[in-house]
Amino acid sequence: MASPDKKSSLAALTLAAVGIVYGDIGTSPLYTMKEVFSKEHGLALTPENLLGVVSLIVWGLIIIVSLKYVTLVLRANNRGEGGIMALMALALSSVTRNSRWYFPLLVMGLFGATLFYGDSVITPAISVLSAIEGLSVATETFDPYVVPLTVAVLVGLYSVQARGTAGIGKWFGPIMVVWFATLAVMGVVNIIDAPEILYALNPWHALHFLDGNRFLAFIALGAVVLAFTGAEALYADMGHFGAKPIRMAWFLVAFPALALNYLGQGALLLMHPDAVTNPFYQQLGAWSIYPLVALSTMAAIIASQATISGTFSMTKQAIALGFLPRMKIEFTSASQIGQIYIPAVNWLQMAVVVMAVVGFGSSSDLAAAYGIAVTATMLVTTILTFFVIRYRWKYNLLLCLASTGFFLVIDLSLFSANMLKLFHGGWFPLLLGTILFTLMLTWKRGRELVFENLQKHAIPLEDFLASLFISPPTRVPGTAIFLRGESDGVPHAMLHNLSHNKVLHERVVFLTVRMMEVPYVPTTDQVRIHLLGDDCYQMDVTYGFKNVPDIPAALELAKDQGLEFEMMETSFFIARQTVVANPVRGMALWREHIFVAMSRHARGAADYYQIPSNRVIELGTKVEI
């Protein structure tokens, strides 16, 4: 029997998961039904079509969310961590670097990750915009103010990110529970008035709708998918809450409320087809509009906050895995290490979100842009999951195809339907994704070229030390720590120091930081020290992509291996690389110029590794790529 403490902890995590994980999918009822029957799609609002659409949505929630994500994908975790970056790292570790699948998996996973950024721009825009559009249902007087109010809410949201969400975050769960309870109650009220909508629970109506409408049904799928936006968040947030609380939050709270509300909106439209302009806000009558606008705006802000936090987390992982340059990362909570803030990402994302709101102008126009990013990410997740099941878990090929093939067909159908919107807004997330994909691949390849250049000119460290101590230089008091990459040979900073100062500290440590394709490396495994002789040491510090790099903390860990450091007697020598584009070799020249610009604006190693600035000596070196 579970102890009371474990039960209360599970309940608290489940409540928190309701607030963070299900904000995006929880706000989908604001706009999904409205979009399916919009005039642009040409789908007639008949009882038969209505039953078919509601059946598609309910069974989509069962198949895509309950079966695919909650049952299957949550099992494919990278040491407890989820998200497409973690899944990509897991899939890549399932095959060898020489495998024909390695590069395609890298490209696919990376593009899926960049589409998440496109999704993270549209989610705040469409969620807040559709919530505030409820004012227009009450009176057309508010029409000119919808976009300005949306922009004001979003600017306010991004402006407070630096303060963190630790204080208000505890209210996210209770507010979203109220939101889901409201969805359920509204649904039940309308189902009671038109119980025939319950026929939609029979999947025959979904299949009959697809068969009877063919092309129109295919177009409608592009809007039906809006009901499943945010499904990826179940997987992405697994590391914060664990699989069990996420499953409980889905089956006990989110899924029943969503299913009831979609059935309720269907019941409303059976009775009042004219409510199709905005069925969500007309479920309880005119008296409820203003309270619903207030509650839905809070829910939309929470959904947006979860997406913004997810963007920060994804960026931190991308930096650690070598796909983005180092950036300034601030920790906004003393107790929760996952609470981070990245200023550059925050303000850039805010600018793009505001542009999207002003440029598209309505949730209907934004909805066209939404589906492509979501369905493409779903598709990539399914493919990566197949490789994990097949090559890491070593399951039988037929079993792997059976477990993912069905979902692959559904994902391809939804993605194909959304590709019809390519010229009606779908280009927007694809453009964002393509730009970020190019930047990430360019940075990754650029770092490889820098590494190859340094390795080509590297002097083997042990040979150099052996020759150096034949006629040793003057030793001065203190400890010198030289940062060096893997297989770099003698650090350039050391060569410069010996060349100009002609001295060597009495103790010399060569420090190499390694990033592993796992979320976390425990502190007991982070530091390894090798004696090189003559008071010289090689110190290897290993982190996972969700660990916080902290060299002073690593030096404290070195005490357990007999190496103690006094910070005021320790100097860190770091080579500051100036990268120069070379038209003869490497990447295309335009990519080299992009890489050079990214290198110039990258955060310094000292800041990134939290090394005290007053203990750092930087020495310049030029590298051609």
Curated annotation (Swiss-Prot):
<feature type="transmembrane region" description="Helical">
    <location>
        <begin position="10"/>
        <end position="30"/>
    </location>
</feature>
<dbReference type="InterPro" id="IPR053952">
    <property type="entry name" value="K_trans_C"/>
</dbReference>
<comment type="function">
    <text>Transport of potassium into the cell. Likely operates as a K(+):H(+) symporter.</text>
</comment>
<keyword id="KW-0997">Cell inner membrane</keyword>
<dbReference type="InterPro" id="IPR023051">
    <property type="entry name" value="Kup"/>
</dbReference>
<keyword id="KW-0633">Potassium transport</keyword>
<protein>
    <recommendedName>
        <fullName>Probable potassium transport system protein Kup</fullName>
    </recommendedName>
</protein>
<keyword id="KW-0769">Symport</keyword>
<dbReference type="InterPro" id="IPR053951">
    <property type="entry name" value="K_trans_N"/>
</dbReference>
<keyword id="KW-0630">Potassium</keyword>
<feature type="transmembrane region" description="Helical">
    <location>
        <begin position="215"/>
        <end position="235"/>
    </location>
</feature>
<keyword id="KW-1133">Transmembrane helix</keyword>
<comment type="similarity">
    <text>Belongs to the HAK/KUP transporter (TC 2.A.72) family.</text>
</comment>
<feature type="transmembrane region" description="Helical">
    <location>
        <begin position="397"/>
        <end position="417"/>
    </location>
</feature>
<keyword id="KW-1003">Cell membrane</keyword>
<dbReference type="InterPro" id="IPR003855">
    <property type="entry name" value="K+_transporter"/>
</dbReference>
<keyword id="KW-0813">Transport</keyword>
<feature type="transmembrane region" description="Helical">
    <location>
        <begin position="422"/>
        <end position="442"/>
    </location>
</feature>
<feature type="transmembrane region" description="Helical">
    <location>
        <begin position="102"/>
        <end position="122"/>
    </location>
</feature>
<feature type="transmembrane region" description="Helical">
    <location>
        <begin position="250"/>
        <end position="270"/>
    </location>
</feature>
<feature type="transmembrane region" description="Helical">
    <location>
        <begin position="172"/>
        <end position="192"/>
    </location>
</feature>
<feature type="transmembrane region" description="Helical">
    <location>
        <begin position="284"/>
        <end position="304"/>
    </location>
</feature>
<dbReference type="Pfam" id="PF02705">
    <property type="entry name" value="K_trans"/>
</dbReference>
<dbReference type="Pfam" id="PF22776">
    <property type="entry name" value="K_trans_C"/>
</dbReference>
<dbReference type="GO" id="GO:0005886">
    <property type="term" value="C:plasma membrane"/>
</dbReference>
<keyword id="KW-0812">Transmembrane</keyword>
<keyword id="KW-0472">Membrane</keyword>
<feature type="transmembrane region" description="Helical">
    <location>
        <begin position="50"/>
        <end position="70"/>
    </location>
</feature>
<feature type="transmembrane region" description="Helical">
    <location>
        <begin position="340"/>
        <end position="360"/>
    </location>
</feature>
<keyword id="KW-0406">Ion transport</keyword>
<feature type="transmembrane region" description="Helical">
    <location>
        <begin position="142"/>
        <end position="162"/>
    </location>
</feature>
<dbReference type="GO" id="GO:0015293">
    <property type="term" value="F:symporter activity"/>
</dbReference>
<dbReference type="GO" id="GO:0015079">
    <property type="term" value="F:potassium ion transmembrane transporter activity"/>
</dbReference>
<feature type="transmembrane region" description="Helical">
    <location>
        <begin position="369"/>
        <end position="389"/>
    </location>
</feature>
